Amino acid sequence: MELSKYIRSIHDYPKKGILFRDITTLIKNKDAFKNCVDQMSKILNKLNYDKIAGIESRGFIFASPLSYNLSKPHILMRKKNKLPAERHSVDFELEYGKATLEIHKDSIKTKIPSEDKVKKKIDEKNRNIYSCF
């Protein structure tokens, strides 16, 4: 299934010069969403890791079914001050500003799939899909 046709592109959102990839059109289509999760599951099944990390907020949508499919724990990477226990923070820059992600310190000593390893396993036609998450 060509998943890119289920993702809407919105120019100049949330500000001028940004091309926003709207995944709501993918997740509202049960067949496309299932196919997307199944494709990601196949890719992740080939990698060595301990947990699935869901990055707020789009990542939560995909990490939960992936965690279930692959029988792996799901850890949350959240915006600053959203996690209740002791946290580790990382600041980074986006196309339109700065942000901070946090993870519970007791989740740090785990192997999670890196973006580079996942991208190497994705076929060319769906590579842009992964970049939306």
Model-derived features: where do they sit?
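PRPP-associated nucleotide enzymes
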Residues: 1-133
